[in-house]
UniProtKB/Swiss-Prot annotation:
Subunit structure: Forms a cylinder of 14 subunits composed of two heptameric rings stacked back-to-back. Interacts with the co-chaperonin GroES.
Record localization: Cytoplasm
InterPro entries in UniProt: Chaperonin_Cpn60_CS, Cpn60/GroEL, Cpn60/GroEL/TCP-1, GroEL-like_apical_dom_sf, GROEL-like_equatorial_sf, TCP-1-like_intermed_sf
Residue ranges crossing the lipid bilayer per the database entry: none
Catalysed reactions, as listed in the record: ATP + H2O + a folded polypeptide = ADP + phosphate + an unfolded polypeptide
GO terms, molecular function: ATP binding; ATP-dependent protein folding chaperone; isomerase activity; unfolded protein binding
Any single GO BP term: protein refolding
Organism of origin: Streptomyces albus G
Keywords tagged on the record: ATP-binding, Chaperone, Cytoplasm, Isomerase, Nucleotide-binding
GO cellular component: a single term: cytoplasm
Pfam families documented for this protein: Cpn60_TCP1
Protein name as annotated: Chaperonin GroEL 1
Coiled coil: none
Residues engaged in binding ATP: 29-32, 86-90, 415, 479-481, 495
Length: 540
């Protein structure tokens, strides 16, 4: 396939046009008075959203050179979303401003490499300043304020704060669609997995059709249990030791005479045991069984480690305060495992989350982490139409991410003002000279853009507001929702420092690379062949 090239100033201008097309589409959504964008979908209803990354993903430019610029900024939004989960619009606005200011200087003869150095140094200084001024989140009302600001809904803020309170910072909060109106919270304590009892005869509560085991022994087996001869020695030891203590068996499968013996003993009232299948498949099943073993203090019985069921003693069994088993689910509450072992396992899963590239793997690891660390909250969201439902779901997911980021690194004043105040550390150009000093100045000018557009979207003169905010003390700023100046943290207008920091760092990373670009290479569009078979008609 032939390629076509563009060089020098022409190339950079084409990239800038693409950057502007994407950023102009996204920046109308920033701030409490930002607008929405409607995205046409090939199938189903259109999507209405104010989520920067969702909009960015949909933008493709006709011109292949401009499209390169748009794709680069899309990368800014996506990366910020991956790291902080929110702040994608802020990142896009910053990238546009950095590109605009930077290219102006490159066109005037500044060295792109020196500009890049200056930009990188300035961003590092501003990031450090933001982290210094960050205030750790210590109570529920702060969490509610962060979530409410991101979701633009106070009730949702309080709901997320409650969910965070229940599951802790490692817990999982998922958003599901519901058929009813409004938003509800559903909390599952302990470790739950989606496998139920193997026989309905095992239930202890006929009315609710569930088996509740108080203070049971827990046997975890990696393979299938088919022969009662394998299980008998262990059952006898359990009866001798615990008398009436129930037993939960988690295995790949319990079948044949082993299952029928358990059921018969349960019906006769001689012994209470409940068998469930292990969740997941393959390596994931092994990992989840390992998690359960750590949580309950059990040892996984597996041929590969030389442990056989018929030789196992009571020391391989785990314990828990209570286990509830329904037709479809099993929940283990307060496992009897060693707290240090559980923390070690949590640290191991966190390390795996850091190192994985796959979103699917990351999601599954997060779920495992949550089950070990405390619990799972499901927020069910409903709305009048499918379009509104999707929009609310987007907002909720953003708000949860923002809240997590806030708990991690703390909060700064919101509404774009934290950046305006943080760039004051650049007033002496960090002691740089020449084009490097110009690079520092580029960051200083670009940092006011998020605040400017928050004000513009509220129908005000952007630069007038940014100048006024720059004169205020740290922590003070402009509240676009009320149109007043004041202490933003007190007013509940706060941003997670991780979101603001990631937005700036990712925007600068792409912008400084874009400034050092000299050539663009794109594929030559295929020429359409003229259709054959049409003769020339002549009129005489």
């Amino acid at each position: 396939m032939a390629k076509i090239l563009k060089f020098d100033e022409d190339a950079r201008r084409a990239l800038e046009r693409g950057v502007n097309q994407l950023a102009d589409t996204v920046k109308v959504t920033i701030g409490p008075k930002g607008r929405n964008v409607v995205i046409d979908k090939k199938f189903g209803a259109p999507t209405i959203t104010n989520d920067g990354v969702t909009i960015a993903r949909e933008v493709e430019c006709d011109d292949p050179y401009e499209n390169l610029g748009a794709q680069l900024v899309k990368e800014v939004a996506t990366k910020t979303n991956d790291i902080a989960g929110d702040g994608t619009t802020t990142a896009t606005v910053l990238a546009q401003a950095l590109v605009r200011e930077g290219l102006r200087n490159v066109a005037a003869g500044a060295s792109p490499a020196a500009l890049k150095k200056g930009i990188d140094a300035a961003v590092a200084a501003v990031s450090a300043e933001l982290l210094d001024t960050a205030r750790p989140i210590d109570d529920k009302s702060d969490i509610a304020a962060v979530a409410a600001l991101s979701a633009q809904d106070k009730q949702v803020g309080e709901l997320i704060a409650e969910a965070m309170d229940k599951v802790g910072k490692d817990g999982v909060i998922t958003v599901e669609e519901s058929n009813t109106f409004g938003v509800d919270l559903d909390f599952t304590e302990g470790m739950a997995f989606d496998k139920g009892y193997l026989s309905p005869y095992m239930v202890t509560d006929q009315e609710r059709m569930e088996a509740v085991l108080d203070d049971p022994y827990i046997l975890i087996h990696q393979g299938k249990i088919g022969s009662i001869q394998d299980l008998l020695p262990l059952l006898e030891k359990v009866i001798q030791a615990g008398g009436s203590k129930p037993l939960l068996i988690i295995a790949e499968d319990v079948e044949g005479e082993a299952l029928s013996t358990l059921v018969v003993n349960k019906i006769r009232g001689t012994f209470n045991a409940v068998a469930v299948k292990a969740p997941g498949f393959g390596d994931r099943r092994k990992a989840m069984l390992g998690d359960m073993a750590t949580l309950t203090g059990a040892t996984v019985i597996a041929e590969e480690v030389g442990l056989k069921l018929d030789q196992a003693g009571l020391d391989v069994l785990g314990t828990a305060r209570r286990v509830t088993v329904t037709k479809d689910d099993t929940t283990i509450v307060d496992g009897g495992g060693n707290a240090e072992d559980v923390q070690g396992r949590v640290a191991q899963i966190k390390a795996e989350i850091e190192s994985t590239d796959s979103d699917w793997d990351r999601e599954k690891l997060q779920e495992r982490l949550a089950k070990l660390a405390g619990g799972v909250c499901v927020i069910r969201v409903g709305a009048a139409t499918e379009v509104e439902l999707k929009e609310r779901k987007h907002r909720l997911e953003d708000a949860i991410s923002a809240t997590r980021a806030a708990v991690e690194e703390g909060i700064v004043s919101g509404g774009g003002s934290a950046l305006v105040h943080a760039v004051k550390v650049l007033d002496d150009n960090l002691g740089r000279t020449g084009d490097e000093a110009t690079g520092v100045a580029v960051v200083r000018r670009a940092a006011v853009e998020p605040l400017r557009w928050i004000a513009e979207n509220a129908g005000l003169e952007g630069y007038v507001i940014t100048t006024k905010v720059a004169e205020l003390d740290k922590g003070q700023g402009f509240n676009a929702a009320t149109g007043e100046y004041g202490d933003l943290v007190k007013a509940g207008v706060i941003d997670p420092v991780k979101v603001t920091r990631s937005a700036l760092e990712n925007a600068a990373s792409i912008a400084s690379l874009l400034l050092t670009t000299e050539t663009l290479v794109v594929e030559k569009p295929a020429e359409e062949e003229p259709e054959a078979g049409h003769g020339h008609g002549h009129s005489h």
